[in-house]
């Protein structure tokens, strides 16, 4: 069994910047020649396990001695007996005093000059060799005249003479993986042949060996896999591959690059996850060597660093200090945190003026390495999850001791936070200047290279959560940079990412940002027509038939998309779907259907009718209405309906206060205000005659409801009046409609996917936000905005028909314009951005029909069609006809 031992200083360094670092490959280029890595036998004892970490071999030898000189003195052989008395040395002639001899290191290696006394033991010589080379005593064998020297013998007993030549070979141990050792040794040998050859021609052999080595890794036993993978490190394979990568010959560099990439990438696909995690020490070794040989910008180094980041994200890092059993420790990975933070900081500083900002790879790796670092620091240092700076000099056991272990890391982490936050503040400030320029019509790009800003801010917020007072600093900065922060949210927040950290601080965002995040929670509308949920509905039975189609469908089917068609009408497509949404929502919230009540002060606002719970079918209609509202939001259709605050807050899982009922019941609101503001003495005189009860009407009958135990006999006083008002409001607007709200929320949840997402949707919005999303714009339709967002097909803007059209529209009433818009697009209410917020621009299409025909529309495409009417009066007559409510709202009928 042979093993290739290198001559490189390899003191088990585990991080790029660890204290005991390895020399750069440039510094020991001569050491890395193939004549220093030679084949030698290695004997392994069955009872001796593989080392837990690679052994260090640092060769320090005389450069002049290239050959061993054999002694011509005594022919007496060294005794192999373990007993000194059995050695036949008594008759030998000995010269007492100092002795000089040579030890040739391994087969064909350098030679050491050893000075010793004749009575020194062989073991002491082994120890000198270890001090000089780093090769452990247990790994050495000394051969002289064909025989192995025993530790207990003296040099005199072995008949070592001046200028004698000894051969050092490695001790062979038994191993359970001889094929793996042979594979890697063959690969290392191949590499050194390539490095030594003047014109190398690399083959696929190295790649083949690496794939075979990975393929033979034990897949079911983590311990065996770890032992197996150690062979790769013990054989110095990473050093050999990096040496090949550092070769001045391009063919060698390409071969090494391909081989290392193959090994790193294939390990993740070939090995199961538990086994792949044992790969961490190998990747750390590659990172360390590549950093020294090629630098942190090298693509192969970046690949290894990213792979290590994905591992530490999964396995974490050890929280102990000095444990050899940990796969990855803090000191292994914190140098990567420092390196990446420095790189990101530099890139942020230049991104304000260049097209390139921090790279996605750097930011992703930074976040990956930070995850276990934050966990270890917080778990070990702060009992309450927050770190207070400056750190106290705690020297007691437990967390205080742990705190001292990571004092430098904690300080550095806080410095990283402050530095990156300052750089981000500068970037956001410059973004706002450019955003203002864009609003003025300038074409200046916002900030080139800003695509990673949001991810960096998210990580900074996560770091801030670990330090007392840091979050206040972070969110105050976000408040000052609200415009640029919101721009990043709208531009770069993606579906399926975690945005709770933003939604919890919605006050530092704009409506556009809050709407964007809310819409990301909703399912995405799919375009696969074969998976659409088809509905054929009679207009005269709109509500009941819609209920049957929606309430009894599987939620997954509804999330897949809708296909809508009215009976006896040929029109289909998105336009008809928009029309159906508008009319079915108007029917659901029609007070005559007794499901919802409108607010006295704002008749656009609705909340569940408390009396509707008496009918079980009504409760099912609340589930149906929850589904319909979620689908309308999902399809981005404004329906002209808004919720009252008491309804909205309950959907968000929040408490109801007195101020929240102002619109829903102004009479009760004023009464409660008076009770709370009355003189305490008057209240205590029982002038009001109130007790903790409520009189409620239900199905034309009155019912007395106690607001608390013994409510009938509990008099309202100045001390308990606040409690009375709170209980009264809770019963009127929470308890009385709890079942209806629960059914609506369940219907909404059916579409959105979970109750947590349902609450997050409403919690991330203000009531006014939902008004604008669900109801749409409340400002009168602007003809100028309409005109600016309309294209022409067949007509030119300068044609008289186009001029007549806009003049006629300009003189229409607000209601006529709404009807015309609905006829044209099936949209009754525009988005808050106006026509610019629609999915596409509108179009006036020139038809070839006769002049006596009315205009027609293709609502799916926002297209209005009419012939080139010969006069303005004729056009006005035709447009007046289609802007009658009964015509515009019945588009598509036969």
Each PLM stretch: what is its role?
Residues 106-127, 149-153:
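Short, contiguous acidic and Ser/Thr-rich linear segments
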Residues 145-171:
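Eukaryotic mixed-charge, acidic/polar low-complexity intrinsically disordered regions
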Residues 88-91, 113, 794:
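Short, intrinsically disordered linker segments that flank or connect zinc-binding domains
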Residues 115-140, 163, 584:
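Short amphipathic, charge-patterned alpha-helical segments
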Residues 5-48, 53-56, 60-66, 70-71, ...:
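Long, low-complexity, acidic Ser/Pro/Gly-rich intrinsically disordered regulatory segments
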Residues 138, 358-361, 391-894:
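Long, Ser/Thr/Pro/Gly-rich and/or acidic low-complexity regions in intracellular
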Residues 96-102, 112:
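Short structural boundary motif marking the start of a folded domain
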């Amino acid at each position: 069994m042979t093993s290739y031992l290198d001559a490189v200083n390899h003191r088990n360094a585990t991080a790029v910047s660890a204290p005991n670092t390895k020399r750069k490959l440039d510094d020991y280029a001569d050491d890395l020649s193939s004549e220093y890595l030679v084949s030698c036998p290695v004997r392994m004892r069955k009872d001796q396990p593989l080392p837990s970490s690679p052994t260090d071999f640092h060769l320090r030898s005389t450069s002049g001695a290239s050959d061993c000189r054999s002694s011509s003195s005594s022919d007496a052989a060294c005794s192999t007996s373990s007993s000194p008395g059995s050695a036949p040395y008594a008759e030998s002639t000995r010269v007492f005093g100092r002795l000089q001899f040579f030890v040739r290191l391994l087969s064909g290696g350098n030679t050491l000059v050893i000075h010793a006394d004749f009575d020194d033991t062989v073991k002491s010589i082994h120890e000198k060799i270890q001090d000089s080379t780093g090769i452990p005593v247990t790994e050495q064998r000394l051969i002289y005249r064909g025989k192995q020297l025993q530790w207990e013998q003296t040099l005199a007993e072995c008949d070592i003479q001046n200028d004698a030549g000894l051969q050092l070979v490695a001790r062979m141990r038994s191993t359970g993986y001889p094929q793996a050792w042979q594979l890697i040794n063959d690969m290392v040998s191949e590499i050194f042949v390539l490095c030594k050859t003047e014109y190398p021609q690399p083959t696929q052999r190295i790649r083949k060996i690496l794939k075979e080595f990975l393929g033979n890794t034990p897949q079911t036993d983590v311990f065996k896999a770890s032992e197996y993978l150690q062979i790769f490190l013990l054989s110095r394979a990473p050093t050999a591959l990096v040496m090949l990568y550092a070769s001045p010959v391009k063919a060698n560099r390409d071969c090494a690059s391909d081989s290392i990439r193959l090994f790193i990438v294939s390990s993740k696909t070939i090995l199961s996850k538990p086994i792949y995690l044992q790969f961490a020490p190998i990747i750390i070794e590659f990172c360390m060597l590549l950093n020294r040989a090629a630098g942190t910008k090298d693509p192969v180094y970046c690949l290894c660093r990213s792979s290590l980041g994905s591992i530490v994200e999964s396995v974490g890092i050890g929280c102990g200090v000095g444990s050899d059993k940990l796969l990855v420790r803090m000191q292994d990975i914190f140098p990567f945190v420092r390196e990446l933070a420095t790189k990101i900081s530099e890139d942020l500083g230049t991104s304000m003026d260049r097209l390139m900002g921090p790279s996605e790879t750097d930011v992703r790796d930074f976040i990956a390495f930070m995850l276990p670092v934050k966990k270890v620091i917080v778990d070990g240092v702060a009992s309450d999850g927050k770190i207070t700076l400056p750190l106290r000099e705690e020297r007691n056991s437990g967390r205080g001791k742990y705190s001292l272990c990571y004092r430098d890391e904690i300080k550095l982490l806080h410095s990283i936070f402050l530095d990156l936050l300052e750089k981000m503040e500068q970037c956001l400030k410059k973004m706002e200047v450019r955003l203002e320029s864009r609003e003025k019509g300038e074409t200046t790009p916002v900030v080139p290279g800003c695509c990673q800003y949001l991810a960096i801010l998210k990580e900074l917020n996560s770091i801030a959560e670990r330090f007392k007072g840091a979050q206040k600093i972070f969110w105050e900065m976000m408040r000052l940079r609200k415009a640029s922060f919101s721009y990043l949210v709208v531009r770069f927040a993606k579906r399926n990412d975690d945005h709770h950290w933003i939604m919890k601080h919605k006050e530092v965002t704009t409506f556009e940002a809050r709407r964007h995040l809310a819409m990301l929670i909703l399912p995405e509308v799919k375009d696969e027509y074969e998976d659409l949920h088809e509905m054929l509905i009679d207009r005269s039975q709109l509500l009941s038939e819609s209920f049957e189609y929606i309430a009894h469908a599987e939620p997954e089917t509804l999330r897949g998309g809708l296909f809508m068609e009215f009976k006896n009408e040929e029109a289909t497509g998105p336009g008809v779907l928009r029309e159906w949404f508008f009319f079915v929502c108007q029917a659901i919230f029609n007070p005559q259907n007794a499901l919802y009540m409108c607010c006295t002060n704002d008749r656009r606002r609705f909340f569940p009718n408390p009396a509707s719970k008496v009918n079980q079918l009504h409760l099912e209609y609340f589930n149906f209405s929850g589904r319909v509202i979620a689908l309308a939001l999902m399809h981005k259709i404004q329906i002209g309906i808004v919720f009252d605050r008491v309804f909205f807050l309950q959907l968000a899982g929040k408490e109801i206060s007195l101020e929240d009922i102002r619109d829903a019941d102004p009479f009760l609101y004023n009464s409660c205000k008076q009770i709370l503001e009355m003189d305490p003495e008057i209240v205590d005189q029982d002038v009001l005659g109130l007790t903790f009860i409520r009189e409620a009407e239900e199905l034309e009958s009155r019912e007395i409801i106690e607001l608390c135990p013994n409510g009938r006999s509990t008099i309202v006083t100045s001390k308990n009046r606040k409690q009375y008002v709170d209980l009264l409001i809770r019963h009127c607007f929470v308890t009385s409609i709890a079942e209806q709200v629960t059914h609506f929320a369940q219907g909404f949840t059916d579409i959105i996917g979970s109750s947590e997402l349902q609450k997050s949707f409403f919690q991330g919005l203000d009531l006014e936000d939902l008004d604008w999303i669900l109801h749409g714009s409340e400002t009168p339709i602007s003809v100028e905005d309409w005109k600016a967002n309309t294209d022409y097909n067949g007509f030119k803007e300068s044609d008289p028909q186009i001029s007549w059209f806009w003049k006629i529209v300009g003189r229409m009433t607000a209601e006529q314009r709404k009807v015309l818009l609905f006829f044209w697009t099936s949209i009754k209410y525009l988005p808050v951005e106006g026509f610019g917020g629609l999915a596409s621009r509108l179009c006036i299409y020139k038809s070839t029909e006769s002049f006596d025909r009315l205009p027609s529309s293709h609502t799916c495409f926002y297209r209005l069609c009419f012939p080139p009417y010969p006069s303005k009066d004729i056009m006005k007559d035709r447009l007046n006809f289609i802007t009658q409510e009964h015509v515009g709202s019945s588009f598509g009928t036969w």
